[in-house]
Every structure is written in structure tokens, then in C-alpha cells.
Amino acid sequence: MIRIIAIVVLFFLQCQADLPPVMKGLEENKVTGVWYGIAAASNCKQFLQMKSDNMPAPVNIYSLNNGHMKSSTSFQTEKGCQQMDVEMTTVEKGHYKWKMQQGDSETIIVATDYDAFLMEFTKIQMGAEVCVTVKLFGRKDTLPEDKIKHFEDHIEKVGLKKEQYIRFHTKATCVPK
């Protein structure tokens, strides 16, 4: 029985070890507001199928709602502007859980200076498959090259490849309501 408990605990710790740490000293209230998509990298099949050089940038708005973070994301599709709203449960400031149709998700804010950039890590557990997406946002629709280089270095550290990376060149045309 003790052996089974030890295996379960080790499995749980391994699952948690796959997540990067939340940015130290994160001030959640300073994260709220509008963020423009600058770049993203993902091993998700759906992302890789949709990825193109002229993929329009998403716009994300973070807001606090009864102590939980809400994410409203809008993006342009062939059918016009689409919006996805997600109410996330706070695990700790900067670490959130939420459910998707595809599986359980966790989002972590790994870096931000609050005024210019924000880097977000999302992990989706879809059965046995793990889907990882890292996104770079800016308060404006452009960022200095050093911030983009930092993001490109970070995606390699979490096991993503250059082929799984996209830099949004088309400016955002949809803003969440």
C-alpha cells in the first residue's frame, strides 16, 4: 500500500514539475487590461495546422472577477471576429486552472514588466497527450527585439522548436467586448 501511495505522489510531483514557476512577486492587479499578441509557440496539433505567416494577432484582456482571473481573447477568422472567454480558478497568483472541451488546462504567467510585455505558459492535458503553448503579449502591438529574443530563448527551454513558433505580422483587428 505504501508503495502505491509513493508511486501516486511521484506521478503527481512529475506532473507539477512540467510547469514553469510563476514570476516571483507577481502583482496580479497590474496584469489586468489589454494585451496584444506578438508571438506564440505550441506543439498543439490545431495550432500547427492553423499556423501561417499572415496569421492575425489575437488580443487578450485579463480581468479579475471575485478573486479569479478572467481571460477574454479575440481573433480574426474567415467567419469574422471570434471571442473566447475563460473564467480561470486561481491556484496561486499567476497560476490558473480552467477546463476546455479538449481537456484540463493550466496557465502560468512566467514573466512581465506590466507596462510593455507579458509571457504566458499554458499546458492542456488531452488524455495521454500534453499540449504546450507559450505566448508573448505586448501592451502595444510591437515590442523591442530584445523582448522577442528573450521569448525565443524561453520557448527552447520548455521543449518547443523553432518550427512551432510564429511571430504575428498582421495587426490585430478584433478586440474583446
Curated annotation (Swiss-Prot):
It comes from the Eukaryota. GO terms for molecular function: small molecule binding. It is found in: Secreted. Disulfide bonds join C81-C174. The keyword Signal applies. GO terms for cellular component: extracellular region. Keywords: Disulfide bond, Olfaction, Secreted, Sensory transduction, Signal. Synthesized in Bowman glands, which secrete the mucus that bathes the cilia of the olfactory neuroepithelium. InterPro entries: A1-microglobln, Calycin, Lipocalin, Lipocalin_CS, Lipocln_cytosolic_FA-bd_dom. GO terms for biological process: sensory perception of smell. Residues 1-17 form the signal peptide. The keyword S-adenosyl-L-methionine does not apply. It holds the Pfam family Lipocalin. Belongs to the calycin superfamily. Lipocalin family. This is Olfactory protein. The lineage of its organism: Eukaryota, Metazoa, Chordata, Craniata, Vertebrata.
